[in-house]
Design a protein with these regions (language model features):
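Positively charged n-region of N-terminal signal peptides that target proteins for export
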Residues: 1-4
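Second-shell loop/turn segments in exported
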Residues: 20-23, 38-47, 75-79, 121-131, ...
Protein backbone atom coordinates (compact mmCIF):
# COMPACT_ATOMS: atom_id res chain seq x y z
CA UNK A 1 0.00 0.00 0.00
CA UNK A 2 2.88 2.36 0.89
CA UNK A 3 4.40 1.87 -2.57
CA UNK A 4 1.07 2.66 -4.26
CA UNK A 5 0.78 5.93 -2.34
CA UNK A 6 4.37 6.88 -3.26
CA UNK A 7 3.69 6.05 -6.91
CA UNK A 8 0.53 8.16 -6.99
CA UNK A 9 2.35 11.07 -5.33
CA UNK A 10 5.16 10.92 -7.89
CA UNK A 11 2.63 10.71 -10.71
CA UNK A 12 0.83 13.84 -9.47
CA UNK A 13 4.13 15.71 -9.16
CA UNK A 14 5.12 14.63 -12.67
CA UNK A 15 1.82 15.72 -14.18
CA UNK A 16 1.85 19.08 -12.42
CA UNK A 17 5.41 19.75 -13.57
CA UNK A 18 4.61 18.58 -17.08
CA UNK A 19 1.72 20.96 -17.61
CA UNK A 20 3.41 24.06 -16.23
CA UNK A 21 -0.02 25.68 -15.90
CA UNK A 22 -0.48 27.79 -12.75
CA UNK A 23 -3.68 27.79 -10.72
CA UNK A 24 -5.87 30.90 -10.71
CA UNK A 25 -6.86 31.87 -7.17
CA UNK A 26 -10.39 33.28 -7.09
CA UNK A 27 -10.04 34.47 -3.50
CA UNK A 28 -6.94 36.49 -4.34
CA UNK A 29 -8.85 38.01 -7.26
CA UNK A 30 -11.77 38.82 -4.97
CA UNK A 31 -9.37 40.51 -2.55
CA UNK A 32 -8.19 42.63 -5.49
CA UNK A 33 -11.82 43.59 -6.05
CA UNK A 34 -12.30 44.53 -2.40
CA UNK A 35 -9.15 46.64 -2.37
CA UNK A 36 -10.33 48.64 -5.37
CA UNK A 37 -13.77 49.21 -3.87
CA UNK A 38 -12.19 50.40 -0.62
CA UNK A 39 -11.09 53.52 -2.53
CA UNK A 40 -14.76 54.37 -3.07
CA UNK A 41 -16.18 55.45 -6.45
CA UNK A 42 -13.46 55.62 -9.11
CA UNK A 43 -15.08 57.86 -11.68
CA UNK A 44 -12.82 60.28 -13.58
CA UNK A 45 -11.80 63.31 -11.55
CA UNK A 46 -12.52 61.68 -8.17
CA UNK A 47 -10.06 60.93 -5.36
CA UNK A 48 -10.83 57.26 -5.78
CA UNK A 49 -9.87 57.43 -9.45
CA UNK A 50 -6.42 58.82 -8.60
CA UNK A 51 -5.93 56.36 -5.75
CA UNK A 52 -6.83 53.24 -7.71
CA UNK A 53 -4.62 54.33 -10.61
CA UNK A 54 -1.66 54.38 -8.22
CA UNK A 55 -2.76 51.04 -6.76
CA UNK A 56 -2.80 49.35 -10.17
CA UNK A 57 0.42 50.97 -11.39
CA UNK A 58 2.32 50.11 -8.21
CA UNK A 59 1.16 46.50 -8.39
CA UNK A 60 1.94 45.83 -12.05
CA UNK A 61 5.31 47.58 -11.87
CA UNK A 62 6.33 44.87 -9.40
CA UNK A 63 5.02 42.08 -11.62
CA UNK A 64 5.33 42.93 -15.33
CA UNK A 65 8.37 42.96 -17.61
CA UNK A 66 7.57 46.56 -18.48
CA UNK A 67 4.71 49.00 -17.86
CA UNK A 68 3.51 51.73 -20.22
CA UNK A 69 1.26 54.62 -19.20
CA UNK A 70 -0.76 56.12 -22.05
CA UNK A 71 -2.15 59.48 -20.97
CA UNK A 72 -4.96 61.27 -22.79
CA UNK A 73 -7.63 63.89 -22.22
CA UNK A 74 -11.34 63.49 -22.87
CA UNK A 75 -14.69 65.14 -22.41
CA UNK A 76 -17.74 63.76 -20.65
CA UNK A 77 -20.93 64.33 -22.61
CA UNK A 78 -22.85 67.33 -21.28
CA UNK A 79 -19.98 68.69 -19.19
CA UNK A 80 -17.78 71.67 -20.07
CA UNK A 81 -14.57 70.58 -18.34
CA UNK A 82 -11.95 68.20 -19.73
CA UNK A 83 -10.71 65.15 -17.83
CA UNK A 84 -7.38 63.33 -17.76
CA UNK A 85 -7.29 59.60 -18.38
CA UNK A 86 -4.60 56.91 -18.33
CA UNK A 87 -4.45 53.51 -19.98
CA UNK A 88 -2.12 51.22 -18.02
CA UNK A 89 -0.33 48.54 -20.06
CA UNK A 90 1.51 45.69 -18.32
CA UNK A 91 3.65 43.74 -20.79
CA UNK A 92 5.16 40.26 -20.61
CA UNK A 93 7.52 38.50 -23.04
CA UNK A 94 7.99 41.43 -25.41
CA UNK A 95 10.24 39.42 -27.75
CA UNK A 96 7.61 36.83 -28.64
CA UNK A 97 6.29 37.02 -32.23
CA UNK A 98 2.80 36.29 -30.87
CA UNK A 99 1.35 39.18 -28.88
CA UNK A 100 -2.17 39.11 -27.42
CA UNK A 101 -4.14 41.59 -25.32
CA UNK A 102 -6.34 40.91 -22.31
CA UNK A 103 -8.07 44.05 -21.10
CA UNK A 104 -10.57 45.51 -18.65
CA UNK A 105 -11.67 49.01 -17.68
CA UNK A 106 -10.66 50.39 -14.30
CA UNK A 107 -12.91 53.46 -14.03
CA UNK A 108 -16.44 53.45 -12.61
CA UNK A 109 -19.63 55.17 -13.67
CA UNK A 110 -20.15 58.75 -12.39
CA UNK A 111 -23.91 58.28 -12.02
CA UNK A 112 -26.23 55.53 -10.78
CA UNK A 113 -28.63 56.41 -13.58
CA UNK A 114 -30.32 52.98 -13.60
CA UNK A 115 -31.11 53.03 -9.88
CA UNK A 116 -34.82 52.71 -9.10
CA UNK A 117 -34.38 55.32 -6.37
CA UNK A 118 -34.29 58.56 -8.36
CA UNK A 119 -32.47 60.35 -5.54
CA UNK A 120 -29.45 58.16 -6.35
CA UNK A 121 -29.36 58.85 -10.08
CA UNK A 122 -26.62 61.51 -9.89
CA UNK A 123 -24.48 59.66 -7.34
CA UNK A 124 -21.33 57.77 -8.42
CA UNK A 125 -21.36 53.99 -8.07
CA UNK A 126 -18.88 51.71 -6.30
CA UNK A 127 -18.60 49.54 -9.41
CA UNK A 128 -17.63 46.24 -7.78
CA UNK A 129 -18.70 44.30 -10.85
CA UNK A 130 -18.71 47.05 -13.48
CA UNK A 131 -15.17 48.31 -13.00
CA UNK A 132 -13.40 46.24 -10.34
CA UNK A 133 -14.13 42.67 -11.47
CA UNK A 134 -12.21 42.65 -14.74
CA UNK A 135 -9.28 44.44 -13.12
CA UNK A 136 -9.33 41.92 -10.27
CA UNK A 137 -8.88 39.07 -12.76
CA UNK A 138 -6.12 40.91 -14.62
CA UNK A 139 -4.17 41.57 -11.42
CA UNK A 140 -4.28 37.90 -10.46
CA UNK A 141 -3.11 37.02 -13.99
CA UNK A 142 -0.28 39.53 -13.54
CA UNK A 143 0.83 37.67 -10.41
CA UNK A 144 0.74 34.31 -12.18
CA UNK A 145 2.63 35.61 -15.21
CA UNK A 146 5.42 36.79 -12.92
CA UNK A 147 5.66 33.35 -11.31
CA UNK A 148 5.14 31.31 -14.51
CA UNK A 149 6.25 33.13 -17.67
CA UNK A 150 4.12 32.47 -20.75
CA UNK A 151 5.40 31.26 -24.11
CA UNK A 152 3.64 34.14 -25.90
CA UNK A 153 3.54 37.89 -25.35
CA UNK A 154 0.80 38.95 -22.95
CA UNK A 155 -0.35 42.56 -22.71
CA UNK A 156 -2.66 43.28 -19.79
CA UNK A 157 -4.36 46.58 -20.61
CA UNK A 158 -6.30 48.52 -17.99
CA UNK A 159 -8.49 50.95 -19.94
CA UNK A 160 -9.64 54.22 -18.44
CA UNK A 161 -12.78 56.26 -19.16
CA UNK A 162 -14.98 53.42 -20.39
CA UNK A 163 -18.12 54.20 -18.41
CA UNK A 164 -18.86 57.93 -18.59
CA UNK A 165 -21.10 57.76 -21.65
CA UNK A 166 -24.77 58.39 -22.28
CA UNK A 167 -27.37 56.13 -23.84
CA UNK A 168 -27.68 56.48 -27.61
CA UNK A 169 -24.17 57.87 -28.10
CA UNK A 170 -21.77 54.93 -28.28
CA UNK A 171 -18.60 56.96 -28.65
CA UNK A 172 -19.31 58.87 -25.46
CA UNK A 173 -18.25 55.56 -23.88
CA UNK A 174 -14.92 53.72 -24.17
CA UNK A 175 -12.77 56.84 -24.40
CA UNK A 176 -9.65 55.01 -23.27
CA UNK A 177 -9.92 52.16 -25.76
CA UNK A 178 -10.81 54.59 -28.55
CA UNK A 179 -7.64 56.58 -27.84
CA UNK A 180 -5.59 53.39 -27.52
CA UNK A 181 -6.90 52.07 -30.83
CA UNK A 182 -6.20 55.31 -32.69
CA UNK A 183 -2.74 55.70 -31.11
CA UNK A 184 -1.48 52.14 -30.72
CA UNK A 185 1.39 51.98 -28.22
CA UNK A 186 1.99 48.30 -29.04
CA UNK A 187 2.63 46.79 -32.46
CA UNK A 188 1.50 43.42 -33.75
CA UNK A 189 -1.39 42.53 -31.45
CA UNK A 190 -2.85 39.28 -32.83
CA UNK A 191 -6.16 39.37 -30.94
CA UNK A 192 -7.79 40.75 -27.81
CA UNK A 193 -10.10 39.66 -25.02
CA UNK A 194 -12.02 42.17 -22.92
CA UNK A 195 -13.29 41.17 -19.47
CA UNK A 196 -16.20 43.24 -18.18
CA UNK A 197 -18.75 42.55 -15.44
CA UNK A 198 -17.36 39.10 -14.69
CA UNK A 199 -17.82 39.07 -10.91
CA UNK A 200 -21.62 38.65 -10.69
CA UNK A 201 -22.64 36.09 -8.05
CA UNK A 202 -25.09 34.66 -10.60
CA UNK A 203 -22.54 34.74 -13.42
CA UNK A 204 -23.90 33.71 -16.81
CA UNK A 205 -21.77 34.41 -19.88
CA UNK A 206 -23.44 34.08 -23.27
CA UNK A 207 -21.50 34.79 -26.45
CA UNK A 208 -21.59 38.54 -27.05
CA UNK A 209 -22.94 39.04 -30.57
CA UNK A 210 -20.30 41.46 -31.88
CA UNK A 211 -17.57 39.11 -30.71
CA UNK A 212 -18.90 36.38 -32.95
CA UNK A 213 -18.47 38.70 -35.93
CA UNK A 214 -15.08 40.08 -34.88
CA UNK A 215 -13.32 36.80 -33.99
CA UNK A 216 -15.50 33.71 -34.42
CA UNK A 217 -12.54 31.33 -34.17
CA UNK A 218 -11.48 32.62 -30.75
CA UNK A 219 -15.05 32.64 -29.44
CA UNK A 220 -15.54 29.02 -30.46
CA UNK A 221 -12.21 27.98 -28.96
CA UNK A 222 -12.87 29.67 -25.61
CA UNK A 223 -16.43 28.47 -25.15
CA UNK A 224 -15.43 24.97 -26.27
CA UNK A 225 -12.61 24.88 -23.73
CA UNK A 226 -14.94 26.18 -21.03
CA UNK A 227 -17.18 23.20 -21.73
CA UNK A 228 -14.21 20.80 -21.65
CA UNK A 229 -13.05 22.27 -18.35
CA UNK A 230 -16.60 22.23 -16.93
CA UNK A 231 -16.63 25.98 -16.34
CA UNK A 232 -20.37 26.35 -16.05
CA UNK A 233 -20.71 30.14 -16.31
CA UNK A 234 -19.97 30.08 -20.04
CA UNK A 235 -23.21 29.46 -21.92
CA UNK A 236 -23.25 28.27 -25.51
CA UNK A 237 -25.90 30.76 -26.59
CA UNK A 238 -25.57 34.06 -28.41
CA UNK A 239 -26.50 37.13 -26.38
CA UNK A 240 -27.03 40.78 -27.34
CA UNK A 241 -24.51 42.99 -29.14
CA UNK A 242 -22.80 45.33 -26.67
CA UNK A 243 -20.70 48.43 -27.31
CA UNK A 244 -17.67 47.79 -25.11
CA UNK A 245 -13.90 48.25 -25.32
CA UNK A 246 -13.58 45.44 -27.88
CA UNK A 247 -15.48 47.48 -30.50
CA UNK A 248 -12.94 50.35 -30.85
CA UNK A 249 -10.11 47.79 -30.91
CA UNK A 250 -11.73 46.13 -33.90
CA UNK A 251 -13.06 49.22 -35.67
CA UNK A 252 -10.06 51.54 -35.33
CA UNK A 253 -7.10 49.19 -34.91
CA UNK A 254 -8.29 46.13 -36.83
CA UNK A 255 -7.63 43.88 -33.83
CA UNK A 256 -9.93 40.81 -33.77
CA UNK A 257 -11.34 41.43 -30.30
CA UNK A 258 -14.02 39.76 -28.21
CA UNK A 259 -15.93 40.66 -25.05
CA UNK A 260 -16.59 38.35 -22.11
CA UNK A 261 -19.45 40.05 -20.28
CA UNK A 262 -22.56 39.31 -18.23
CA UNK A 263 -24.73 42.36 -18.85
CA UNK A 264 -27.73 40.90 -16.99
CA UNK A 265 -26.49 41.65 -13.49
CA UNK A 266 -27.61 39.70 -11.53
CA UNK A 267 -30.37 38.26 -13.76
CA UNK A 268 -33.25 39.14 -16.08
CA UNK A 269 -35.57 40.00 -13.17
CA UNK A 270 -33.35 42.25 -11.02
CA UNK A 271 -30.85 44.93 -12.07
CA UNK A 272 -27.73 46.06 -10.21
CA UNK A 273 -26.00 47.47 -13.32
CA UNK A 274 -25.38 51.22 -13.03
CA UNK A 275 -27.05 51.30 -9.61
CA UNK A 276 -25.92 51.77 -6.02
CA UNK A 277 -26.28 47.99 -5.59
CA UNK A 278 -23.14 47.28 -7.62
CA UNK A 279 -21.20 46.38 -4.48
CA UNK A 280 -18.84 43.56 -3.43
CA UNK A 281 -21.60 41.62 -1.67
CA UNK A 282 -23.17 41.00 -5.08
CA UNK A 283 -19.95 39.56 -6.51
CA UNK A 284 -18.10 36.35 -5.69
CA UNK A 285 -14.66 34.78 -5.73
CA UNK A 286 -16.14 31.73 -7.47
CA UNK A 287 -17.31 33.79 -10.44
CA UNK A 288 -13.94 35.52 -10.80
CA UNK A 289 -12.23 32.15 -10.58
CA UNK A 290 -14.26 30.68 -13.43
CA UNK A 291 -13.23 33.48 -15.78
CA UNK A 292 -9.66 33.43 -14.50
CA UNK A 293 -9.37 29.68 -15.05
CA UNK A 294 -10.30 30.07 -18.70
CA UNK A 295 -7.86 32.95 -19.15
CA UNK A 296 -5.08 30.82 -17.64
CA UNK A 297 -5.98 28.05 -20.09
CA UNK A 298 -5.87 30.57 -22.95
CA UNK A 299 -2.45 31.85 -21.90
CA UNK A 300 -0.72 28.55 -21.16
CA UNK A 301 -2.48 25.80 -23.16
CA UNK A 302 -1.81 27.31 -26.56
CA UNK A 303 -2.41 24.09 -28.50
CA UNK A 304 -6.14 24.80 -28.18
CA UNK A 305 -5.90 28.38 -29.44
CA UNK A 306 -3.26 28.51 -32.15
CA UNK A 307 0.36 29.70 -32.14
Amino acid sequence: MRFIIIFLFLLIVHLSCDTGVPVFDGQKAYNNLLEQCAFGPRNPGSKGHSAVKKYIVDMVQELADTVLLQNFSFDIYGEKKSYNGTNIIARYNLSSPTQVLIGAHWDTRPWADKDADKSNNRKPIIGANDGASGVAVLLELARLLKLSPASIGINLVFFDAEDSGVSGNNESYCKGSIYFSKNLPIAGIKEAIILDMVGDRELSLPIERNSLSFNRKLVRALWSRAKDLEISAFKGVVGPAIYDDHVPLYQYAGIPAIDIIDIRYPNTFVNYWHTMDDVPQNCSAQSLEQVGMLMVDYIYNRKFYGP
